[in-house]
UniProtKB/Swiss-Prot annotation:
Keyword Translocase: no
Matches recorded under Pfam families: Spheroidin (PF05541)
InterPro entries: Spheroidin
Function: Major component of viral occlusion bodies, the protective complexes in which the virions are embedded in the cytoplasm of their insect hosts.
Identification of the protein by name: Spheroidin
GO cellular component, one term: viral occlusion body
Organismal lineage: Viruses, Varidnaviria, Bamfordvirae, Nucleocytoviricota, Pokkesviricetes
Source species: Amsacta moorei entomopoxvirus
Region (Disordered): 953-979
Binding partners and assembly: May form disulfide-bond-linked aggregates.
Keywords: Acetylation, Disulfide bond, Late protein, Viral occlusion body
Low complexity bias (residue ranges): 953-970
Record has Aminoacyl-tRNA synthetase as a keyword: no
Residue numbers bearing the N-acetylserine modification: S2
Length: 1003
């Protein structure tokens, strides 16, 4: 914006060298652009050191000095029509000298390159009578626009010197209606739009000024469209205190008066002449002149202007509407120790409304429209040990975002603002941000003494699976093979089972899901003519199981290759998942974005699965072991989904676990050898070599919140031993370095408490014999060993053959001579089943959640481009600036051939995929070396994080482990050790506060 028609509103002296100046656009139908390049001329054109400093007086305006006479102004808003600056002169100046300098400033900013001076003869009249220039004792700035769209300026100097500066290619100029100056307290206007030819040698210009006419205006009536007197009184109070209006000409758009209070019944304004057509625009503003948008106000003059012929005028009827019923309040805590953001429900705010009446509010409270003053904040420090430092609120009016932020004083468990703090409630959702230090760890922890034991069911062959008449599947909790058999309901009630996992689930690119051979549609893709019941696979049985404290899970990813797993990564992207932590991190953060159509489908599919169960188990089978970055991809996907759900009020989050293949130890030893046994060798080597365990400590990724379920291949290659049960359980908790990295734990005890063993019943026969076949005795022995090691439990693939049916004796133990030889299965674990309630309540969605989640996802499923769709979604919630700015940056980030040397941009199926080749010599994990797609960290500069974090273990510290196996030729890693594996996680609050960069726990 180089050709700017500026006008001066006020000039106020601050000191002998400093003056405050308010400028606005002379053409009141326009607004300032987001970036304005402005000329600030030298005070003395002959002295290069006489520069004038321009400083902003508003937080929405940023001034960047380009050189001695040019500045760049960045405007944070779309409807800004007025700017306030401070001018710092190099010497002492008086007001006359300031006005003279301002004349040069305005003229320099309206000038452009291709200009010429024309001879012009000016004639001035006031109300039809000749006016001498010397009778105008004020600065005179008359703007015009030429036929090319360039603005020009007529000053006193132009009139005195009979010249005019215009574009050399212009044919004519138009002087539009505008305010000119003040004469004896009366405003003087140019009323008519007049055009003059500038192609001749000399141009004759007549400026016909008109002195204003005073008229008294008032409203005919104010009508409040609300249902009850309480709401009517509320709107009356708000309108009386904050209601303002402006009056303008319906024909020319010329504004006669601004910021007039609605509470004043009779107001005198000045118009250029009578008769005149008047229009009214009403709004709400605060004491600082900021728009509030508290209500919708319409005037009858907007459609039918008032025709005024006398010195008294009625301005029609105002109608006042509420834009919403009540606003839902959200209170979120920003932990400066770890960077985590989470809802805070253990405090309440003591507020005062517009009438001064006290109001108490907490998270999820509902507030009426208005402005609320904060008096105190009460915190339950026994439940959540937090230290608050600042409070921030923001509200939107149109495309403008206004912020209020103050520091807090602490008095025991009570906080008060250091200076008056108010926040505006003018939308259906209001968010209050609190900043401080907290040791509230939001990592989904396993409840104390939790034990899981149960079965993994084959969805195709299990007798416990039944097909409903409407096409859906469900569990049959009452089925039994014979009178000695035990049904699932009885097993659960008697505490022999408290977890059931359905196997062989999968997702497909066409938005369909499957459990075994049965395919069904994504629950969000229901046709209008179908009911929700047709998509409620396992939802009824899940409710029955949850009522009995039993968890239902779904196992996804078994017996498929990498390209068939959720997310449908391409072969090229799969290679990235073999790489070092920097490339894996960058890829996961760019892929897991709802603007990515494949991830958008993946997220909807995962939520559809979670509608049927409590959590999803992701199985890393042999085909995926060479791609350990897939674990990181899934951890990032869950984080993005949980962020989106939590900030939109859905407390039931996405839970998951991981299954890994297990190798057995050396045949030379009875117990597994650490060098050979444990987690699959390829997975372990690449996971440790590429330092992926460090990413699982990052707040941008969610560690498995439930447990890791390990499974075994076969015992045909197992070494001979007298205690296979102990051997198998020991194998499941080997590779502590890998397991601690996945689970973000720091010791063997915490790790074992998160590991559940599983065994496939029909292969539990070493060397093809039935000596150690699966049975009640073997299960009890394994349960005893698992309990000794402090494991989470046993979740076994059930063998439902007639030979090995699960009868009641198989569940309870082994009888010999009518005496129980082995302890009860459930007594070995000695677990209170109510410990599952926390997991049940946290994970898995209900019908009411599903509809809300569907609305959340629907915001991304429109005809807009992915970037614009996401930006508008965030913008509606006040989390981002206007979408045009971000759309511009998004286009830059996806422009080919604009990346650094270490960055590639690949186009696939019409989509841009950006990744980096390496961290670079000095890179740290997650640092970018090129100018590719904007990472999630960079987005945080432009929006508030929305927000659920799984912070790291409070006292965990992990040391690097090196595998002695050799890597494959295709594997890639970061040689510079891009992730800091030696960073300790301090649980002390003060250390978190003093050293936030080293604290990743938030404790």
């Amino acid at each position: 914006m180089s050709n700017v028609p500026l006008a001066t509103k006020t000039i106020r002296k601050l000191s002998n060298r400093k003056y405050e100046i308010k400028i606005y656009l002379k053409d009141e139908n326009t607004c300032f652009e987001r970036v304005v390049d402005m000329v600030v001329p030298l005070y003395d054109v002959c002295n290069e050191t006489s520069g004038v400093t321009l400083e902003s007086c508003s937080p929405n305006i940023e001034v960047i000095e380009l050189d001695n006479t040019h500045v760049r102004i960045k405007v944070h808003g779309d409807t800004l029509k007025e700017m306030c600056f401070e001018l710092l002169f190099p010497c002492n100046v008086n007001e006359a000298q300031v006005w003279k300098y301002v004349s040069r400033l305005l003229l320099d900013n309206v000038s452009h390159n291709d200009v010429k001076y024309k001879l012009a003869n000016f004639r001035l009249t006031l109300n039809g009578k000749h006016l001498k220039l010397k009778e105008i004792d004020q600065p005179l700035f008359i703007y015009f626009v030429d036929d090319l769209g360039n603005y020009g300026l007529i000053t006193k100097e132009n009139i005195q010197n009979n010249n005019l500066q215009v574009n050399k290619d212009a044919s004519f100029i138009t002087i539009f209606p505008q305010y000119a100056y003040i004469c004896l307290g009366r405003k003087v206007y140019l009323n008519e739009k007049v055009t003059f030819d500038v192609t001749t040698d000399a141009t004759n210009i007549t400026l016909d000024f008109n002195k204003s006419v005073n008229i008294a205006v008032s409203f005919l009536d104010i009508y409040y469209e609300v249902n009850n007197n309480e709401q009517k009184d509320l709107l009356k109070d708000l309108l009386k205190r904050y209601g303002e209006f402006e009056v303008y000409n319906a024909d020319t758009g010329l504004i006669y008066a601004k910021n007039l209070s609605i509470k004043n019944y009779d107001t005198v304004i000045q118009v250029e002449r009578l008769p005149v057509n008047l229009k009214v625009r009403a709004y709400t503003k605060d004491e600082n002149g900021r728009n509030l948008c508290l209500m919708k106000i319409t005037s009858s003059t907007e459609v039918d202007p008032e025709y005024v012929t006398s010195n008294n005028a009625l301005l029609g009827t105002l109608r006042v509407y509420k834009k919403f019923d009540k606003s839902h309040l959200k209170i979120v805590m920003h932990n400066r120790g770890s960077g985590n953001v989470f809802p805070l429900r253990s405090l309440y705010l003591e507020l005062s409304n517009v009438k001064g009446y006290p109001v108490k509010a907490s998270d999820t409270s509902r507030l009426d429209v208005g402005i609320y003053k904060l008096n105190k904040i009460y915190v339950d420090n026994d439940e959540n040990k937090i230290i608050l430092e600042e409070i921030e609120a923001e509200y939107r009016c149109g495309r403008q975002v206004f912020h209020e932020r103050v520091k807090l004083n602490k008095h025991q468990c009570k906080y008060t603002p250091k200076c008056p703090f108010q926040f505006v409630v003018n939308s259906p959702d209001t968010t209050i941000h609190l900043y401080g230090i907290s040791n509230v760890c939001l990592k989904p922890k396993v409840p104390k003494n939790l034990r899981l034991w149960g079965w993994i069911l084959d969805c195709d062959t299990s007798r416990f699976i039944k097909h409903m008449a409407d096409g859906s599947d469900d569990l049959d909790l009452d089925v039994r093979l014979n009178r000695n058999d035990i049904c699932l309901k009885q097993a659960i009630k008697q505490h022999y089972t408290n977890v059931i996992i359905l196997e062989y689930a999968n997702t497909y690119p066409n938005c369909t899901l499957s459990l075994g051979n049965n395919r069904f549609n994504n629950v969000f893709d229901m046709n209008d003519n179908k009911t929700i019941s047709e998509y409620t696979n396992f939802t009824k049985s899940r409710q029955d199981l949850n009522n009995m404290s039993c968890i239902l899970g779904i196992n996804i990813g078994n017996s498929v290759n990498i390209s068939s797993l959720p997310g449908w990564v391409t072969p090229h992207e799969a290679k990235i998942l073999r790489s070092g932590c920097a490339r894996v991190r960058e890829f996961c953060k760019s892929f897991c974005d709802l603007s990515n159509k494949r991830f958008y489908a993946m997220a909807r599919d995962l939520v559809s699965l979670l509608f049927m169960c409590n959590y999803v188990n992701i199985e890393i089978n042999e085909a995926v072991c060479e791609y350990p970055g897939y674990v990181i991809l899934f951890a990032r996907a869950i984080k993005v989904i949980n962020d989106l759900l939590l900030i939109n009020g859905v407390d039931n989050l996405a839970g998951y676990s991981i299954s890994l293949p297990i190798h057995y130890g050396s045949t030379e030893k009875t117990l597994p050898n650490e060098k050979y046994g444990g987690v699959d060798k390829k997975f372990k080597y690449l996971f440790l070599k590429n330092k992926l365990k460090d990413l699982m400590r990052d707040a941008d990724f969610v560690q498995p919140p439930l447990y890791i379920s390990t499974y075994f291949r076969t015992l045909l290659d197992a070494p001979p031993t007298d205690n296979y049960e102990k051997y198998l359980v020991d194998s499941s908790v080997q590779s502590q370095d890998v397991l601690q990295g996945l689970l973000n734990t720091c010791n063997t005890i915490d790790t074992n408490a998160r590991v559940a063993s599983s065994v496939i019943g029909y292969v539990y026969e070493p060397c093809g014999t039935s000596e150690h076949k699966i049975g009640s005795e073997a299960l009890c022995k394994m349960a005893k060993e698992a309990s000794r090691l402090g494991n989470l439990g046993l979740v076994n693939r059930i063998n439902e053959s007639n030979y090995n049916k699960c009868n009641k004796y198989g569940y309870r133990g082994v009888y010999e001579n009518n005496k129980l030889k082995t302890k009860y299965y459930r007594e070995i674990f000695d677990c209170n089943p109510n410990n599952n309630n926390e997991l049940i309540s946290r994970y898995g969605y209900r019908i009411m959640d599903l509809h809300k989640i569907g609305e959340i996802f629907a915001n991304y499923d429109e005809s807009e481009s992915p970037c614009e769709r996401r930006c508008h979604y965030l913008e509606d919630r006040g989390l981002l600036y206007g979408p045009e700015y971000v759309h511009h940056r998004y286009q830059e980030s996806c422009t080919p051939n604009t990346f650094g040397n270490n960055t590639n941009c690949v186009t696939r199926n019409g989509e841009q995929h950006v990744y980096e080749n390496s961290c670079g010599d000095n890179a740290t994990c997650g640092r970018r070396t090129g100018y590719g797609r904007r990472s999630r960290d960079e987005w945080n500069d432009y929006r508030k994080p929305h927000v659920y974090d799984n912070c790291a273990d409070a006292n965990s510290s992990s040391s690097d482990s090196c595998s002695d196996s050799s890597s494959s030729s295709e594997s890639e890693s970061d040689s510079d050790g891009c992730c800091d594996t030696d960073a300790s996680l301090d649980s002390d609050i003060e250390n978190c506060y003093q050293n936030p960069s080293k604290c990743d726990a938030g404790c």
